[in-house]
Swiss-Prot record:
GO terms for molecular function: transferase activity, transferring alkyl or aryl (other than methyl) groups. SUPFAM superfamilies: S-adenosyl-L-methionine-dependent methyltransferases. Belongs to the class I-like SAM-binding methyltransferase superfamily. CmoB family. It comes from Helicobacter hepaticus (strain ATCC 51449 / 3B1). This is tRNA U34 carboxymethyltransferase.
Amino acid sequence: MQESLNSNDFKEYAAKKAKHITSAKNIAPLLECIASLPTIPSHFYSDNGIHIVAQDKTLAQKYHKAIYTLATQLKPWRKGPFFLFDIHIDSEWQSFMKWQLLAPHCNLEGKYIADVGCNNGYYMFEMLLQGKKLYKKIIGFDPSGIFKCQFDFINHFINAPIEFELLGVEDLLAYSQAHNQSFDVIFCLGVLYHRFDPINTLKILSQSLNKGGELILDTLIYESNEEICLCPAQSYAKMSNVYFIPSIPTLKGWCERANLYDFEVINLTPTTTQEQRQSAWVDSQSLSAFLNETQTRTIEGYQAPLRGYFKLKKR
């Protein structure tokens, strides 16, 4: 998205994009079903997942079948888990494991926050609790219709003051300019290796931050001390949309080109089948099918997934 659009033109563009996504024949009926769900006052908390507790358990039980049926229609559930009343939405990723790594390094109070590639909003619900409601605003960006449906479904019961924009990272700077507001903290988790243009992506993230603003970055890392980058020929761990997996020195150089400094390595951790695994809520293969028999290499013969978690600042 070109950031040269004026505010009104960008907002019109964003509205048209959202309408196109939400009017798709596989998405519109789901959104209608979500909107027709009963109001069930609830509260939520985090404990190895997001737990949603109904204040009126009789009312929740009355609509159990309808809620459960709709939840299954919203598959695949990649991020979670969610414990919605007595329904355990056992997502492919145990996302709380990532959040527990990141949370001690995130000061969200009083911050204007973006979650780029927010999926179904799992991490935004965690941020909401982490920020103790003293944040300025939390906005998620993801152009996926099914993830928007999942977010709306969960938030129907949580009723959290979170915004979800059906926009991609390429739209972030234009969004920021159209709303005359840069971000204090941007989360970009599991997005960079899916981009054709990782340096430009980092520049967009940097340009969308306030001076001194923080980027919390999660990306696949190639284990090497050299300034090199893995560019998979066809696929990586059966993902055909993985294009660049940098070493840490390479990633640091990319970030400096994007005016992102104070490069802090929060954690380096291999992805395990404890964190990512097959589930009845996904209906597809997962990590164990993407690795060799000893789980030391991908099925293509590359290094097994190693995730790096980083914190950077814009100068």
